[in-house]
Swiss-Prot record:
EC number, UniProt record: 2.4.2.-
Pfam families associated with the record: Arabino_trans_C, Arabino_trans_N, Arabinose_trans
InterPro entries linked to this entry: Arabino_trans_C, Arabino_trans_C_2, Arabino_trans_central, Arabino_trans_N, EmbABC_dom1
Organism annotation: Mycobacterium bovis (strain ATCC BAA-935 / AF2122/97)
Residue ranges that the Swiss-Prot or TrEMBL entry lists as coiled coil: none
Family: Belongs to the emb family.
Record's protein name: Probable arabinosyltransferase B
Chain's gene name: embB
Length: 1098
């Protein structure tokens, strides 16, 4: 009876067969529209675009003179130059630069640029440190010489002295067929002046291959593809309706009900979507609170910088690296962010997509996914709380910024929901919509493969539905809409780019990297266990709780073939999504830990399922539940065995952000490991005890639903960490306080960073009571200095950095500046001073010597201390060497003594009243110049004078110190000093913290010249931004290092004086030159056209 009934149920009725037979027109529409959508979508990358062309020609305006034109691609498509020999004849005897593609004094200019240089004896054409041709000057000035021709293209670089012959009588020309010899161009620079002579010409084709827009034909094809795809999906929807089971819209909106639940009236908005529970309130409040006070993700500054520049550039360029190539084919989400920048650049506004994604994920989880997992899950409050808390704890460390993992998590969940809809109701329209969702999720980033994993997990049941429907309506009416649905993403990805440009962008990224092989996937998990921000407490828990729940569920499902009221199919597909994603992640080119944020939604569903599977109703033996509790304690011990670190400024004020959390000297990890040992031991005892043992109220309470309790505890820890950070930092910068201030126009960290515009303005006047007895160092040395000299500083001591050979990119000009002054300073010192200090006004005293060592002491004269006010919160001493001091990063660091002694007025002479140990950033540059900070708030209000007391009691040559006189600096906020209009090179790490500063833009292949550079803290600058933005990798430092001189400025984080917030560097031009005028035009290019490969090689 059962088999017959089942067969009758699965056999279509005559009415349904007749309906399918009469739907011939709908089938044709689905077939034709689907094929049209598919063909047009696939053709989109090949269709022509309109390219904006740009040419750099020189001389300009008929005059000789340098011009700037820094190429965002660094090198041109081709370069030609013609120099009449008359120009050489007219040059002075000493010669000079006829032309160069960079300033001669630029950093590594000879290594990067092309020059035509005349010396007293020769005329040299050099390109990237390669001598293309060198000719004696007398030959070039002879009447036979007509002109010098230089070309540099993909075919190589060649020079030809027209009119001159080599010894064999052949034309005098030479060169190398190497495409990597194309020079970098930041302009055209020359020593020539006056009117341009006839015949002198330079021309460069700027690489603007990515500056394109669709032609009318391509635009029509895109519109046609989208319309045809929509029509095909509607036709598929009509075919789905022919089975007589109601509107597909009702089925899409109908909530998943347990199989045993009674049917009800179908409503447009299901009842479950109109309910509101305490869990909903907690989740929504948690997301909103975290949006305001929570930490941001690692690449927020990177992505915001790209989004802010995209509108001016005309495409979404990755201009921090990779030669300004576009993000395509993965990047449509960034274009949404670029549109949002038209409203505001504030963090709260820009992060709204991730907030919305998190809220929608919870709605889908609570209304669709958990009910689909079976009546046991749907009826379990602990399961809902587990999903809620795991979603929050996984979202907080990964998805509260601009990174796309939150959007991908939502896309994967929507795909899973649609696949389950398709299976439950045997409809193909939800499956087609799932294909669209998966395609757009993949179009966000390669990690969007999680949505593809959802498709693969449901592939077999979907194929069964397709086979059943194929018998009724044929194959093409069903497959064609699917093809269109899967390829319509191409109309978005290639809307303004072509197949050729996207392939070139992909080649550049793969060649430069990071681009890691599939077998290095272990690195992702290795980074997770390192005691760094990538392996911090929050990031470990966000992923490991998902992994623990996943493997626990797999084990239980394999052991128990049938679990009452748990839907095996959806449960196994959910596990398949996670396992499939772990597999697909192997093939993504990067192995960053932040990719784990894409597991947030499916991990929450997994936690809910596991909560039911380990509950007493399923695991009846307390031994098994206790074993799972022990595993949770072990997971917590592992998670807490690291720092409570958060990315960049999000960590300010957070407890234990650079150390393992402790309670009374005992690490929290140790406490949880002890609990693990107790729980594991008790589980082992239960293994040998009678089955009924261990079912007391306490054990049952602990083991009934541990997942939501543990996840809720961790969520509370994360929130408490941020709240503590705000309280400890107030009123200075913290992430949460900055977001609150944004409501009234705050500018983030720029409001709290204080800049000293003129370091020579704040020096105090020495009291001249002992002026007659001052030693040779003047008031700085006091009465009887011992061991201090005006030149007691080693060579190459620079500000806030240590010298490394060879120099890294992004270093200051001080690294390459002369090591001695041409004229001695005020006290005879020839040591260059940092921060713009004027040696003619600022004395120096140091203990460094290569000779015999001695113990050195210095007590300066008293300096008159101005009355305290809010505008002058610091006394600063610029110093170098190994100095004892305090810093946020390292706490107290030992060293030699440099303290500030303050005095009160006495009945006669001043009365010393106390000494202050400096706040010293120290960091990794203990022997560099830096500013020691002494807060006025820590001095008595009636202190009237201060003096420097310095002692170098070590006989080790490396333990030297150097000091300058104390000063009370005039400070302005960075926002006031830099403003919002001057172009700034915002390092990729800092962009979100400085939303009001104007990033340097680029358009038509030419980058804007920045006035300043803002960097993160010293370690992040050295290890992250300097190397990532290196010109070798196609980064912006390739422009600034070659064209500008950088000088670090004296800056301080308001009321957080001991913190290394980062640095502000001011750029000075090597050559004062106006921007070049470009010759712009347009050209229509096919989807396969390419001007050649971008130069990547050395």
């Amino acid at each position: 009876m059962t088999q017959c009934a089942s067969r009758r149920k699965s056999t279509p009725s005559r009415a349904i067969l007749g309906a399918f037979a009469s739907a011939r027109g709908t089938r044709w529409v689905a077939t034709i529209a689907g094929l049209i959508g598919f063909v047009l979508s696939v053709a989109t990358p090949l269709l022509p675009v309109v390219q904006t062309t740009a040419m750099l020609d020189w001389p300009q305006r008929g005059q000789l003179g340098s011009v700037t034109a820094p190429l965002i691609s660094l090198t041109p498509v081709d370069f030609t130059a013609t120099v009449p020999c008359d120009v050489v004849r007219a040059m002075p005897p000493a010669g000079g630069v006829v032309l160069g593609t960079a300033p001669k004094q630029g950093k590594d200019a000879n290594l990067q640029a092309l020059f035509v240089v005349v010396s007293a004896q020769r005329v040299d054409v050099t390109d990237r440190n390669v001598v293309i041709l060198s000719v004696p000057r007398e030959q070039v000035t002879s009447p036979q010489c007509q002109r010098i021709e230089v070309t540099s293209t993909h075919a190589g670089t060649f020079a030809n002295f027209v009119g001159l012959k080599d010894p064999s009588g052949a034309p005098l020309r030479s060169g190398f067929p190497d495409p990597n010899l194309r020079p970098q161009i930041v302009g055209v620079f020359t020593d020539l002046t006056g009117p341009a002579p006839p015949g002198l010409a330079v021309s460069a084709t700027i690489d603007t291959r990515f500056s394109t827009r669709p032609t009318t034909l391509k635009l029509l094809a895109i519109i046609g593809a989208i319309v045809a795809t929509v029509v095909a999906l509607i036709a598929l929807w009509r075919l789905d309706q022919l089975d007589g089971r109601g509107s597909i819209a009702q089925l899409l909106l109908r909530p998943f009900r347990p199989a045993s639940s009674p049917g009800g009236m179908r409503r447009l908005i299901p009842a479950s979507w109109r309910t509101f529970t305490l869990t909903d309130a907690v989740v929504i409040f948690g997301f909103l609170l975290w949006h305001v006070i929570g930490a941001n993700s690692s690449d927020d500054g990177y992505i915001l910088g790209m989004a802010r520049v995209a509108d001016h550039a005309g495409y979404m360029s990755n201009y921090f690296r990779w030669f300004g190539s576009p993000e395509d084919p993965f990047g449509w989400y960034y274009n949404l962010l670029a549109l949002m920048t038209h409203v505001s650049d504030a963090s709260l506004w820009m992060r709204l997509p991730d907030l919305a994604a998190g809220l929608v994920c919870w709605l889908l989880l609570s209304r669709e996914v958990l009910p689909r997992l079976g009546p046991a899950v749907a009826a379990s409050k602990p399961a809902y709380w587990a999903a809620a808390m795991v979603l929050l704890t996984a979202w907080m460390p990964f998805n509260n910024g601009l990174r796309p993992e939150g959007i991908i998590a939502l896309g994967s969940l929507v795909t899973y929901v649609l696949i389950e809809r398709s299976m439950r109701y045997s409809r193909l329209t939800p499956a087609a919509l799932a294909v669209v969702t998966a395609a757009f999720t993949l179009g966000v980033q390669p990690t969007g493969l999680i949505a593809v994993a959802a498709l693969v997990a449901g592939g077999r049941p979907m194929l069964r539905i397709l086979v059943r429907r194929h018998r009724l309506v044929g194959t093409l009416p069903l497959v064609s809409p699917m093809l269109a649905a899967g390829t319509v993403i191409l109309t978005v990805v290639f809307a303004d780019q072509t197949l050729s440009t996207v392939l070139e962008a992909t080649r550049v990224r793969a060649k430069i990297g990071p681009s890691q092989a599939w077998y290095t996937e272990n690195l992702r998990y290795y980074y997770l266990i390192l005691p760094t921000v990538d392996g911090s407490l929050s990031r470990r828990f966000g992923f490991l709780i998902t992994a623990l729940c996943l493997f626990t569920a797999v084990f239980i499902m394999l052991r128990r073939k049938r679990i009452p009221s748990v839907a095996r199919g959806p449960a196994w597909r959910l596990m398949g999504v996670i396992f499939g994603t772990m597999f697909f992640l192997m093939f993504t080119p990067t192995k960053w830990v932040h990719h784990f944020g894409l597991f947030a939604a499916v991990g929450a569903a997994m936690a809910a399922l596991t909560t039911v599977l380990v509950s007493p109703s399923v695991l009846r033996w307390s031994r098994n539940r206790m074993a799972f509790l022990a595993a949770l304690f072990f997971l917590l011990a592992l998670c807490w065995a690291t720092t409570n670190g958060w990315w960049y400024v999000s960590s300010y004020g957070v407890p234990f952000n650079s150390a393992m959390p402790k309670i009374d000297g005992i690490t929290v990890s140790t406490i949880f490991f002890a609990l693990f040992a107790i729980a594991a031991g008790y589980a082992a005892w239960l293994h040998f005890a009678p089955r009924g043992a261990g079912e007391g109220r306490l054990i049952r309470a602990l083991t009934t639903a541990p997942v939501p309790i543990v996840a809720g505890f961790m969520a509370a820890v994360f929130v408490a960490s941020m709240v503590a950070g705000i309280v400890r930092q107030y009123p200075t910068y913290s992430n949460g306080w900055s977001n609150v201030r944004a409501f009234v126009g705050g500018c983030g960290l720029a409001d709290d960073v204080l800049v000293e515009p003129d370091t020579n303005a704040g020096f105090m006047k020495p009291l001249d009571g002992d002026s007659g007895s001052w030693g040779p160092l003047g008031p700085l040395g006091g009465v009887n200095p011992v061991g201090f000299t005006p030149n007691g500083v080693p060579e190459h001591t620079v500000a806030e950095a240590i010298v490394m050979k060879p120099n890294q990119p992004g270093t200051d000009y001080d690294w390459d500046a002369p090591t001695k002054l041409t004229s001695p300073g005020i006290n005879g010192s020839t040591v260059p001073l940092p921060y713009g200090l004027d040696p003619a006004r600022v004395p120096l005293a140091g203990t460094y010597t290569t000779g015999a060592q001695q113990q050195s002491t210095l007590v300066s004269a008293w300096y008159l201390l101005p009355k305290p006010d809010d505008g002058h919160p610091l006394v600063v001493v610029t110093a170098a060497g190994k100095i004892a001091g305090n810093s946020v990063l390292h706490g107290y660091t030992p060293g030699q003594t440099v303290v500030l002694e303050y005095a009160m007025p006495g009945p006669g002479a001043l009365v010393p009243a106390g000494r202050m140990v400096p706040d010293d950033l120290y960091g990794e540059q203990p022997k560099a110049w830096r500013n020691l900070r002494f807060a006025r708030a820590k001095m008595p209000a009636d202190a009237v004078a201060v003096r420097v007391v310095a002692e170098d009691l070590s006989l080790t040559p490396e333990d030297w110190i150097a000091v300058t006189p104390p000063r009370v600096p005039d400070l302005r906020s960075l926002q006031e000093y830099v403003g919002s209009t001057q172009p700034v090179l915002l390092d990729w790490a800092v962009g979100l913290a400085f939303p009001c500063q104007q990033p340097m833009l680029h358009a038509n292949g030419i980058a804007e010249i920045p006035k300043f550079r803002i960097t993160p803290d010293y370690s992040a600058k050295k290890l992250d931004t300097d190397t990532w933005e290196d010109g070798t990798n196609g980064g912006l430092l390739g422009i600034t290092d070659l064209l500008l001189r950088a000088h670090v400025m004296a800056t301080y984080l308001s009321r957080d004086w001991a913190r290394d917030w980062g640095s502000l560097r001011k750029f000075d031009t090597l050559v004062d030159a106006p921007p070049a005028q470009l010759e712009l035009g347009t050209a229509t290019r096919s989807g396969l056209w390419s001007p050649g490969k971008i130069r990547i090689g050395p």
